[in-house]
Amino acid sequence: MRILDVVETTKPISSPIRNAYIDFSKMTSSLVAVVTDVVRDGRRVVGYGFNSNGRYGQGGLIRERFRDRILEAEPASLLNDEGSNLDPHRIWAKMMSNEKPGGHGERSVAVGTLDMAIWDAAAKIGGKPLFRLLAEMKGKEANPRVFVYAAGGYYYPGKDNSALQAEMRGYLNRGYNVVKMKIGGASIGEDRGRIEAVLKEIGSDAKLAVDANGRFDLETGIAYAKMLREYPLFWYEEIGDPLDYALQAAIAEFYPGPMATGENLFSHQDARNLLRYGGMRPDRDWLQFDCALSYGLVEYLRTLDVLAQHG
């Protein structure tokens, strides 16, 4: 059993939507295929992965560093002890060989994209969905249900509040009971109007979360907190720079409702620092680490261990 090739292509997202920081018409994404010599049901097993939007495609790093480390490794060193499947943890260690710790940057996205494709291949070789493979690795019963919500409400050229309401109604019609919209890309007064329009539309059928995408400084974050606490929101997300733990902790003094962050923290060390210094409240706040952006599922499992250590 071996990995025959690792293929990456970078494609534009090509959408005119934007949040408080990002114009997605300029954004790209990496699509990765990990090609194995394994055949299942008459088809070659290929694992696929892609990076989340909000970070650019990582073709350069993948081709210049990480792809060759996988392909140049002794094939047996990338397998589990039984030789019956790929071992994502061992492959991850090969990818990260000769890399200094810290300073994660775009490297975490390149490795994460590859790692997700490797796990996809491992699940296909194992003949089961990834969630079941993971549960078995932990000696647990797989839960086929998971909380999901509809993330939308982007700023869009010519999009007025009626269009925003129609978008949110569409999510409800598809069965979602939590929807999310962007804030911070307009004035606080305009954002208030957008929030009120959505709340009027969804009524008691759903809950609304809002996401600032890390746009606010402390003063603006507090101003929004004072405005947002007037409404029954599901959460107030990513208020300031993700590494400004003191800002995150300070906002809790002004916002009693649930807050959410973690999407742009890329390691278990960053997660630990958020828990140590970010003032996160275990009874109400949400942690949102993104596997594909943060070195993949291998590192995400380490992050879960950190969370368990901190209760």
Residue positions per predicted region:
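Catalytic domains of carbohydrate-active enzymes, especially glycoside hydrolases
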Residues: 167-182
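N-terminal small/glycine-rich loop or linker at the start of catalytic domains
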Residues: 131-159, 194, 201-203, 256
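N-terminal amphipathic alpha-helix/helix-capping segment at the start of soluble metabolic enzymes
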Residues: 1-8, 19-23, 93-102, 124, ...
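Metal- or metallocofactor-binding catalytic centers and their adjacent structured scaffolds
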Residues: 39-125
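Active-site mouth loops of central-metabolism enzymes
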Residues: 104, 145-165, 183, 212-217, ...
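Structured beta-strand/loop patches that form or line metal/cofactor-binding pockets in enzymes
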Residues: 1-59
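Catalytic core of soluble alpha/beta enzymes
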Residues: 185-311
